[in-house]
Design a protein with these regions (language model features):
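Active-site loops and adjacent core secondary-structure elements that bind or stabilize anionic groups
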Residues: 221
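Active-site glycine-rich loop that binds ribose-phosphate moieties when present
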Residues: 122, 192-207
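Conserved catalytic-core helix/loop/strand module for nucleotide-ribose chemistry
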Residues: 1-189, 213-215, 224-227, 232, ...
Length: 434
């Protein structure tokens, strides 16, 4: 094993994904955990100090079943007793749309209590900085919007279903597999919700498999025995051979909060049997998460991850539809051209596209001018960039159409306060060819 956390990060093949649990939300937002959240809503149903203990006993201390019982009782009381309703538009709108009042109120409760803990301001700022160039993406079971708040520009998938049915780029993305407060209906909290989640877990695992095999995964804010982690890992392990399972050891990093360690990181190995196979992962123990984040600044993507995702998304859509967009221009090329002679240019489209006009063929020019073929160039652009090169090949170019277009554009000698001097097309051509 490497000597330090910095050494481990240095050996990462790429920037990591962070798998974020409720522990991070508790740390930075001081929000309640699962049990505390259920207790809060149980207390709204009844002022009996033993109400939650009753739910615990009647449901075998199973939080999923307790969630179902509280949801049923809360919804019933919410419709009968207006005094327990939160008089806010987002709550009423959600209920009117068919969302359970329990989930609508829960989402609102988390929203209004999501206040950053200033004691961890430096940690939060450092983590936010990492989202620019040092983290590939996030996977989380949290409902709150902490990650979206710090990772501006990331694409967010607000539910397991949305993730399963969407093309993902594995870059600058947030996968909220248990739902989000921005969509209360998506929140997974009852036994029925979890059953539906488990039924689709194999599909989710298939969607995440490439990420788990190609990216380092840092689990943070979870207990190592967390059921959510166990279920997802179990579904993923079921897809892998022992050889590939063994590869996960160097890619799985588990951060364990240890209140006694404040100025160092204790590095060890943790093993867990899943599906009959021993899974090993690197374990980091500390209560100073700055020590976790700082070495990650040394592992950078080639360019900001938001841009990388944008490019991947554009190429994916073009490959899928064969339709260029305002962000991607694809010129016809000989399929027999060696790959090492092809290039991809990235830059401001207004400049790159005009440079591409220099290589316009005669056929393309005729189509653009005579048939108004759809090309996003002005007559000025064609004259300035394409015509000089084409005139060296032939003098028979249909320039009249360009002249008409230019004269229409210059119908006034003044545009935006700038005095324009009219010239004939012939004069313009002579000036650009000279």
């Amino acid at each position: 094993m490497q000597n330090t956390w910095k050494d481990i990060v240095k050996d990462f093949p790429t920037t990591p994904f962070l798998f974020v649990g409720s522990g991070l939300t508790r740390r930075y937002f001081d929000l309640p955990n699962w049990e505390e959240l259920l207790k809060h809503f149980a207390a709204i149903i009844s002022d009996d100090s033993f109400i939650f203990q009753r739910y615990m006993q009647e449901n075998d201390k199973d939080y999923e079943k307790i969630g179902s019982a509280i949801s049923k009782d809360f919804d019933s009381k919410w419709f009968r007793d207006a005094s327990i309703r939160t008089n806010e538009e987002d709550v009423y709108a959600a209920v009117e749309a068919g969302v359970s009042p329990f989930k609508a109120e829960l989402a609102h409760f988390i929203k209004i209590n999501s206040i950053k803990n200033e004691a961890y301001a430096e940690e939060i700022a450092l983590l936010q900085k990492l989202t620019e160039n040092n983290i590939s993406g996030f996977i989380t079971t949290n409902y709150d919007t902490f990650i979206e708040d710090i990772a501006a520009g990331y694409k967010t998938y607000n539910s397991q279903e949305e993730l399963i049915f969407s093309p993902i780029q594995e870059m600058a993305e947030i996968f909220k597999i248990h739902g989000s407060v921005t969509d209360p209906a998506s929140i997974v909290i009852t036994a029925e919700d979890y059953q539906e989640f488990n039924d689709k877990c194999a599909y989710l695992a298939a969607k995440l498999l490439t990420i788990f095999m190609e990216y380092p995964i840092i689990f943070i804010g979870y207990s190592i025995t967390d059921n959510d982690i166990q279920k997802i890992l179990s579904a993923i392990i079921a897809c892998l051979s022992k050889k590939n399972v063994d590869k996960l050891q160097n890619r799985f990093i588990f951060v364990k909060r240890n209140a006694a360690i404040t100025d160092d990181i204790k590095i060890g190995t943790y093993s867990k049997e899943i599906n009959g196979q021993d899974i090993f992962m690197t374990q980091l123990e500390t209560n100073n998460f700055k020590l976790i984040y700082e070495p990650l600044t040394e592992k950078q993507a080639a360019m900001p991850v938001k841009l990388l995702r944008f490019f991947k998304d554009q190429f994916y859509n073009f490959t899928l539809t064969n339709q260029p967009s305002k962000h991607i221009f694809v010129n016809a090329f000989d399929p027999n051209v060696p790959l090492d002679q092809l290039c991809c240019s990235i830059g401001q489209n207004s400049q790159l596209v005009k440079r591409g006009l220099v290589g316009m063929s005669l056929e393309q020019c005729y189509k653009a001018i005579v048939f108004d073929n759809i090309i996003p160039f002005s007559a000025d652009d064609i004259l300035a960039f394409a015509i000089p090169n084409l005139l060296s090949q032939t003098s028979k170019l249909p320039l009249g159409r360009l002249q008409v277009q230019i004269e229409q554009d210059l119908s006034s000698n003044y545009i935006s306060g700038i005095h324009l001097i009219k010239k004939s097309v012939e004069q313009f051509i002579r000036s650009v060819v000279a």
